[in-house]
A protein has these predicted regions:
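Generic detector of bulky aromatic hydrophobic side chains
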Residues: 50, 101, 138-140
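Signature for HUH/AEP ssDNA processing cores
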Residues: 1-75, 82-94, 98, 105
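Residue-identity detector for threonine
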Residues: 31, 37, 61, 85-88, ...
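C-terminal accessory nucleic-acid interaction domains of nucleic acid-metabolism proteins
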Residues: 106-228
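Short, solvent-exposed polar/charged micro-motifs at secondary-structure junctions
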Residues: 78-80, 146-147
Length: 228
Protein backbone atom coordinates (compact mmCIF):
# COMPACT_ATOMS: atom_id res chain seq x y z
CA UNK A 1 0.00 0.00 0.00
CA UNK A 2 1.24 3.46 -0.89
CA UNK A 3 0.43 6.89 0.54
CA UNK A 4 -1.79 7.67 -2.44
CA UNK A 5 -3.93 4.60 -1.74
CA UNK A 6 -4.79 5.88 1.73
CA UNK A 7 -5.24 9.43 0.45
CA UNK A 8 -7.67 8.23 -2.22
CA UNK A 9 -9.61 6.20 0.37
CA UNK A 10 -10.01 9.27 2.57
CA UNK A 11 -10.78 11.57 -0.36
CA UNK A 12 -13.37 9.24 -1.91
CA UNK A 13 -13.37 10.80 -5.35
CA UNK A 14 -14.03 7.63 -7.36
CA UNK A 15 -17.75 7.53 -8.17
CA UNK A 16 -17.60 3.72 -8.41
CA UNK A 17 -15.98 3.29 -5.00
CA UNK A 18 -12.87 1.71 -6.44
CA UNK A 19 -10.71 3.72 -4.06
CA UNK A 20 -12.12 2.07 -0.92
CA UNK A 21 -9.52 0.19 1.13
CA UNK A 22 -10.34 -2.98 3.02
CA UNK A 23 -8.35 -5.08 5.45
CA UNK A 24 -8.02 -8.82 5.96
CA UNK A 25 -7.90 -9.08 9.78
CA UNK A 26 -6.13 -12.44 10.16
CA UNK A 27 -2.36 -12.57 9.85
CA UNK A 28 -0.47 -15.59 8.56
CA UNK A 29 0.05 -16.76 12.15
CA UNK A 30 -3.74 -16.65 12.79
CA UNK A 31 -3.54 -13.54 14.98
CA UNK A 32 -5.38 -10.24 14.67
CA UNK A 33 -5.18 -6.73 16.11
CA UNK A 34 -8.90 -6.05 16.43
CA UNK A 35 -12.35 -7.57 16.62
CA UNK A 36 -15.02 -5.87 14.53
CA UNK A 37 -18.65 -6.87 15.12
CA UNK A 38 -20.88 -6.13 12.15
CA UNK A 39 -24.51 -5.09 12.65
CA UNK A 40 -26.27 -4.83 9.30
CA UNK A 41 -29.83 -3.62 8.77
CA UNK A 42 -30.21 -3.99 5.00
CA UNK A 43 -33.97 -4.46 5.24
CA UNK A 44 -34.48 -1.50 7.61
CA UNK A 45 -37.24 -3.55 9.26
CA UNK A 46 -35.79 -3.38 12.76
CA UNK A 47 -33.57 -1.09 14.76
CA UNK A 48 -29.92 -2.07 14.55
CA UNK A 49 -29.05 0.74 16.98
CA UNK A 50 -30.60 -1.02 19.96
CA UNK A 51 -28.63 -4.17 19.17
CA UNK A 52 -25.40 -2.17 18.91
CA UNK A 53 -26.02 -0.33 22.17
CA UNK A 54 -26.78 -3.59 23.99
CA UNK A 55 -23.41 -4.92 22.78
CA UNK A 56 -21.62 -1.72 23.77
CA UNK A 57 -23.27 -1.65 27.21
CA UNK A 58 -21.86 -5.09 27.99
CA UNK A 59 -18.45 -3.85 26.88
CA UNK A 60 -18.76 -0.91 29.28
CA UNK A 61 -19.79 -3.20 32.13
CA UNK A 62 -16.81 -5.47 31.46
CA UNK A 63 -14.41 -2.54 30.94
CA UNK A 64 -13.80 -3.47 27.31
CA UNK A 65 -13.01 -0.39 25.18
CA UNK A 66 -15.43 -0.45 22.24
CA UNK A 67 -15.99 2.10 19.48
CA UNK A 68 -18.98 2.46 17.15
CA UNK A 69 -18.57 3.22 13.47
CA UNK A 70 -21.61 3.88 11.31
CA UNK A 71 -21.43 1.73 8.19
CA UNK A 72 -20.88 3.14 4.71
CA UNK A 73 -24.54 2.52 3.84
CA UNK A 74 -25.79 4.26 6.98
CA UNK A 75 -28.04 1.27 7.72
CA UNK A 76 -25.73 -0.51 10.11
CA UNK A 77 -22.69 -0.21 12.31
CA UNK A 78 -19.39 -1.77 13.27
CA UNK A 79 -18.38 -2.15 16.92
CA UNK A 80 -14.57 -2.10 17.09
CA UNK A 81 -12.41 -3.57 19.87
CA UNK A 82 -8.67 -3.03 19.47
CA UNK A 83 -5.85 -5.05 21.05
CA UNK A 84 -2.50 -3.58 22.06
CA UNK A 85 -0.66 -6.63 20.72
CA UNK A 86 -1.80 -9.24 18.18
CA UNK A 87 -3.92 -12.00 19.76
CA UNK A 88 -5.19 -15.22 18.24
CA UNK A 89 -8.33 -14.83 16.17
CA UNK A 90 -9.78 -17.66 18.25
CA UNK A 91 -9.48 -15.59 21.44
CA UNK A 92 -10.80 -12.43 19.81
CA UNK A 93 -13.87 -14.20 18.43
CA UNK A 94 -14.43 -15.97 21.73
CA UNK A 95 -14.60 -12.59 23.44
CA UNK A 96 -17.11 -11.41 20.85
CA UNK A 97 -19.22 -14.51 21.45
CA UNK A 98 -19.23 -13.86 25.19
CA UNK A 99 -20.21 -10.20 24.82
CA UNK A 100 -22.96 -10.96 22.32
CA UNK A 101 -24.36 -13.79 24.45
CA UNK A 102 -24.43 -11.55 27.52
CA UNK A 103 -26.11 -8.77 25.56
CA UNK A 104 -28.81 -11.18 24.41
CA UNK A 105 -29.42 -12.45 27.93
CA UNK A 106 -29.71 -8.91 29.31
CA UNK A 107 -32.60 -7.91 27.05
CA UNK A 108 -34.87 -10.65 25.76
CA UNK A 109 -36.87 -8.08 23.77
CA UNK A 110 -34.04 -7.56 21.31
CA UNK A 111 -33.96 -9.93 18.36
CA UNK A 112 -30.34 -9.23 17.35
CA UNK A 113 -31.37 -9.89 13.76
CA UNK A 114 -29.02 -7.12 12.73
CA UNK A 115 -25.99 -9.04 13.98
CA UNK A 116 -24.18 -10.23 10.87
CA UNK A 117 -20.72 -11.52 11.71
CA UNK A 118 -17.38 -10.96 13.37
CA UNK A 119 -14.25 -9.79 11.62
CA UNK A 120 -12.20 -11.92 11.66
CA UNK A 121 -14.86 -14.39 10.60
CA UNK A 122 -12.69 -17.46 11.16
CA UNK A 123 -10.45 -18.76 13.93
CA UNK A 124 -7.75 -19.68 11.42
CA UNK A 125 -6.90 -18.71 7.88
CA UNK A 126 -8.63 -20.93 5.32
CA UNK A 127 -6.19 -22.97 3.29
CA UNK A 128 -5.17 -20.93 0.28
CA UNK A 129 -7.39 -18.03 1.34
CA UNK A 130 -7.13 -14.66 3.04
CA UNK A 131 -10.23 -14.67 5.22
CA UNK A 132 -12.99 -12.04 5.13
CA UNK A 133 -12.41 -8.45 4.08
CA UNK A 134 -13.68 -5.52 6.17
CA UNK A 135 -13.80 -2.01 4.72
CA UNK A 136 -11.78 0.56 6.64
CA UNK A 137 -13.57 3.54 8.21
CA UNK A 138 -13.43 7.16 7.04
CA UNK A 139 -14.07 6.47 3.37
CA UNK A 140 -14.43 9.87 1.73
CA UNK A 141 -17.59 9.43 -0.33
CA UNK A 142 -19.49 7.83 2.56
CA UNK A 143 -18.21 10.46 5.01
CA UNK A 144 -19.79 13.20 2.95
CA UNK A 145 -23.12 11.49 3.66
CA UNK A 146 -22.36 11.22 7.39
CA UNK A 147 -21.39 7.54 7.17
CA UNK A 148 -18.19 5.51 7.62
CA UNK A 149 -17.45 7.63 10.70
CA UNK A 150 -17.08 6.94 14.41
CA UNK A 151 -20.10 7.98 16.45
CA UNK A 152 -21.06 8.34 20.10
CA UNK A 153 -23.81 6.36 21.81
CA UNK A 154 -26.41 8.77 20.42
CA UNK A 155 -25.03 7.94 16.96
CA UNK A 156 -23.77 11.46 16.45
CA UNK A 157 -20.46 11.66 14.59
CA UNK A 158 -17.45 12.93 16.51
CA UNK A 159 -16.52 16.38 15.22
CA UNK A 160 -12.83 15.48 15.01
CA UNK A 161 -12.42 11.87 13.91
CA UNK A 162 -8.62 11.96 14.18
CA UNK A 163 -8.68 13.31 17.73
CA UNK A 164 -11.13 10.58 18.68
CA UNK A 165 -8.89 7.90 17.17
CA UNK A 166 -5.84 9.29 18.95
CA UNK A 167 -7.57 8.69 22.29
CA UNK A 168 -8.74 5.10 21.84
CA UNK A 169 -7.82 2.51 24.44
CA UNK A 170 -6.68 -0.97 23.50
CA UNK A 171 -7.29 -4.22 25.36
CA UNK A 172 -4.22 -6.13 26.51
CA UNK A 173 -3.92 -9.88 26.10
CA UNK A 174 -3.72 -10.27 29.88
CA UNK A 175 -7.06 -8.47 30.19
CA UNK A 176 -8.47 -10.54 27.33
CA UNK A 177 -7.47 -13.82 28.98
CA UNK A 178 -9.02 -12.74 32.27
CA UNK A 179 -12.28 -11.82 30.53
CA UNK A 180 -12.40 -15.20 28.81
CA UNK A 181 -11.94 -16.94 32.15
CA UNK A 182 -14.69 -14.92 33.79
CA UNK A 183 -17.20 -15.10 30.94
CA UNK A 184 -16.71 -18.42 29.20
CA UNK A 185 -19.59 -19.35 26.88
CA UNK A 186 -20.13 -21.95 24.13
CA UNK A 187 -19.24 -20.98 20.59
CA UNK A 188 -21.90 -18.84 18.91
CA UNK A 189 -22.57 -19.12 15.20
CA UNK A 190 -23.82 -16.58 12.69
CA UNK A 191 -27.29 -15.19 13.34
CA UNK A 192 -27.70 -13.58 9.95
CA UNK A 193 -27.17 -14.73 6.39
CA UNK A 194 -26.44 -11.99 3.90
CA UNK A 195 -26.02 -11.68 0.18
CA UNK A 196 -22.28 -11.51 0.78
CA UNK A 197 -22.18 -15.26 1.34
CA UNK A 198 -22.69 -17.36 -1.82
CA UNK A 199 -26.31 -16.87 -2.91
CA UNK A 200 -25.85 -19.21 -5.88
CA UNK A 201 -25.11 -22.14 -3.58
CA UNK A 202 -27.74 -24.19 -1.74
CA UNK A 203 -27.16 -23.71 2.01
CA UNK A 204 -26.02 -26.80 3.86
CA UNK A 205 -28.65 -28.00 6.32
CA UNK A 206 -27.46 -29.90 9.36
CA UNK A 207 -29.58 -32.94 10.19
CA UNK A 208 -31.43 -32.69 13.49
CA UNK A 209 -30.22 -35.08 16.17
CA UNK A 210 -32.47 -36.96 18.55
CA UNK A 211 -30.77 -35.33 21.53
CA UNK A 212 -31.98 -31.96 20.25
CA UNK A 213 -35.55 -32.83 21.26
CA UNK A 214 -37.17 -33.67 24.61
CA UNK A 215 -38.09 -37.31 25.17
CA UNK A 216 -41.65 -36.39 26.09
CA UNK A 217 -43.98 -33.45 25.52
CA UNK A 218 -47.35 -32.68 27.08
CA UNK A 219 -50.09 -31.78 24.58
CA UNK A 220 -53.35 -30.22 25.77
CA UNK A 221 -56.37 -30.02 23.48
CA UNK A 222 -59.03 -27.38 24.16
CA UNK A 223 -61.54 -25.73 21.83
CA UNK A 224 -59.92 -27.53 18.90
CA UNK A 225 -56.58 -25.84 19.69
CA UNK A 226 -53.39 -27.56 20.67
CA UNK A 227 -51.23 -26.19 23.49
CA UNK A 228 -47.74 -27.30 24.45
Amino acid sequence: MAYNDFFNHLAGKDAWGRDVIGLYPIRKDNTCSFLCTDFDDKSCEHGYKNDVLAFVNVCKTWNVPCYIERSRSGNGAHAWIFFDTPVTAFKARKLGNAILTEAMSCDAHLSFKSYDRFFPNQDTLPKGGLGNLVALPLQGMARRKGNSVFVDEDFNAYADQWEMLSQIHKLSEVELDLLLQLHAVPTLGELSKTCEEKPWETPHMDAAQSEDYPKQIVLTRANMLMFL
